[in-house]
Amino acid sequence: MAETLAHRFTEFLLESNALKFGDFTLKSGRKSPYFINAGAFDDGKKIAALGAFYAEKISQAIVHNTIPRNIDTVFGPAYKGIPLAVSTAIALNAGHNMTVGYTFDRKEKKDHGDGGWMVGTPLTDGMKVLLVDDVMTAGTAVREVIPKLKAEANVEVVGLVLSVDRMEKTKDSDLSAVKAVEAEFGFPVLSIANVREIFDAAAKMKNSDGTPLLSHDIQQRAAAYLEEYGA
């Protein structure tokens, strides 16, 4: 039986040292039994592979009519979204015969040269824009970037693709950040894998010495964490 996209992505996260199990304190103050470090995708091989995973998820979503095929550009919020947008656009072209643009924003507006807030494929009225980002905690980056996109042109945001959905309640709602963004903006938010899929996949994996990758303690703490904070 072929491994699922989520299972293969979990293997990739582990091989890239982007997924760690242990004791971590998040920005929210929550004590988490796992941590995802997007900064681990720090060379050409890893970022190319990551882009291919995003492209595969996008292709699946197109087949299921979750997002349209006629995407004009992939947009990544600065700074972490920049390599995601570029590598995803390359992978869509190389592996899925889709030629799409890539666009990202500047943190500060440029008043000389090409100028403006945006870099890459220019945004024009009527364009279909697909957002890409790594892990959503509260949806802050999305809420900041949507007004910038709309100020640039009357574009249609057709969706957002994340690497991992943490599936956690936000501080002021029982909704997850993903569901809150979907409800607020009306476009689908997809992920290559969600945290439950990651733990299910990791629970079946073994270390090189044959011992389980996830200790019984980590599995118990993961279950307790999702029981308390899961949405």
UniProtKB/Swiss-Prot annotation:
- Cofactor(s) for this UniProt protein: Mg(2+)
Q: Specify whether Lyase is a keyword of the entry.
A: no
Under catalytic activity, the entry for this protein gives: orotidine 5'-phosphate + diphosphate = orotate + 5-phospho-alpha-D-ribose 1-diphosphate
According to the UniProt entry, where is the signal peptide? none
GO terms (molecular function) for this protein are: magnesium ion binding; orotate phosphoribosyltransferase activity
Concerning NCBIfam families, the annotation shows: pyrE (TIGR00336)
Q: What does this protein do?
A: Catalyzes the transfer of a ribosyl phosphate group from 5-phosphoribose 1-diphosphate to orotate, leading to the formation of orotidine monophosphate (OMP).
Protein name stated in the entry: Orotate phosphoribosyltransferase
**Species of the source:** Bifidobacterium longum subsp. infantis (strain ATCC 15697 / DSM 20088 / JCM 1222 / NCTC 11817 / S12)
